[in-house]
Amino acid sequence: MFAAPSALHVTNLTGLVWLRKHCRACPSRATKLFDLDDETALFYRKVSDASIEALCSELDLSLLIPRFDSHTLPAAIAGAQGRRCDRRPTDLELHNLRHLQALRDACQRSNGDAVWTYRISQETADAYRELDHDRTVALCKTLSVSAFLPRYDATAASRILDRPSGSRALFAAAYETDIVAASEAAWRSTFLTH
């Protein structure tokens, strides 16, 4: 029987395919859009469909993480407020909107899950949960870069993909001890307040 992929799987898949498209079309522009070094841009330019699918299906976390945290998000939103733009949205704006909406939805469902999935602090999860649709759209219309960056550079992604199928999530988690600490702190705060 066919099972539909999770929303996270679809978000990861579309995000990585979009990243690869930009790395193939114009590597120098992709390095600016996603804050990539040349080696990582080359990796994502050459990454295969099978490798993208392996990362998306085996890892239970977002493969693109937010550019802004709880300290930088308010300034980015303040810079976007009051600007009016009556034109068709660009590919970049739609990409940013799709990923910001997915993050906002995750934060509204469960801050603890959002902290783990997106590698963010509890304060950052709170900031994105409070973000309304109008401010999200305004932010997307003013950004000239991706609001989300690849979670892994070329070295980390290659190490994960070199692991046997079925064990990649374990190795990915082992590389990210800071995520585990943030997730445990979020879990404890949720447990203690409810």
Protein language model features and the residues they cover:
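Long, compositionally biased
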Residues: 57-89, 142-179
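A short, structure-level motif marking secondary-structure boundaries and short turns
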Residues: 11-13, 24, 95-97, 108, ...
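Amphipathic alpha-helical packing elements
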Residues: 19-55, 102-140, 144
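Structural motif
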Residues: 6-10, 91, 120
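Short, solvent-exposed interaction modules
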Residues: 82-109, 113-116
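N-terminal domain-start signal
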Residues: 2-53, 57-67, 169, 175-194
